Structure formats: C-alpha cells, structure tokens
Amino acid sequence: MLEQQPTQNPLTVTMLNAQAQQVNKPLRDNVKAALKNYLSQLNGEDPTELYELVLSEIEHPMLDMVMQYTRGNQTRAATMLGINRGTLRKKLKKYGMG
C-alpha cells in the first residue's frame, strides 16, 4: 500500500492577520496557543487530566468529520484513522456518536 506524503502540513487553520491577510497556521500552533492561554489562566494551580481534556477537544471533532467523510462507514473510518473498528466504536460511544 502506498502511503501519501504531503509536501506541506495539510492540518492547517486559515486565519486573518492584523492586515486582514489570510495566513495558514499548522494545527499544532493553534493547539499550542490555546494551551498557553489555558495555562496562563490557572493562577499557579496545576490542572488535572490535562491530557484527556486536550485529547477530547481534538478527538471528538476529528471523529465527527471522519464519520461524515465516510458517510458513517465505520470500517472505512477506522482504516482512515489507523485504528481497529472496535476501538472506533468505543470512541464513538464515548462522545455519544454511536
């Protein structure tokens, strides 16, 4: 099976800069900015379950979009995500999607 090698990071978010120009930023930059903002508001407190919080914020919309893309075909969605179908079903149930 041939693996796709994109020439640029396809996971980008298009935003407008101060000059109203469109700028593509990698998803990771937006996640980093959101985490920086979140952590700055903790006033020295240590968060708990931060990993689960961030994962759920990304995983839920990802599953939603993949299920839409595959028109609900769980086998195809699981293959796209690189997980087995049982794991996909468990994740869909976790987010009330299945």
Curated annotation (Swiss-Prot):
Alphabetical keyword list: Activator, DNA-binding, Transcription, Transcription regulation
The cysteines joined by S-S bonds are none
Q: Any keyword Nucleotidyltransferase?
A: no
Q: Which InterPro entries match?
A: Fis_DNA-bd, Homeodomain-like_sf, HTH_Fis, Trans_regulatory_Fis
Q: Could you tell me which residues form the DNA-binding region?
A: 74-93
- One MF term in the entry's GO annotations: sequence-specific DNA binding
Q: Which Pfam families match?
A: HTH_8
Entry keyword annotation includes Metal-binding = no
Subunit text: Homodimer.
Looking up NCBIfam families in the UniProt record yields:
PRK00430.1
What task does this protein carry out?
Activates ribosomal RNA transcription. Plays a direct role in upstream activation of rRNA promoters.
State the family named in the UniProt similarity comment for this chain. Belongs to the transcriptional regulatory Fis family.
The name this protein goes by in its record = DNA-binding protein Fis
- According to its UniProt entry, this protein's organism is Mannheimia haemolytica
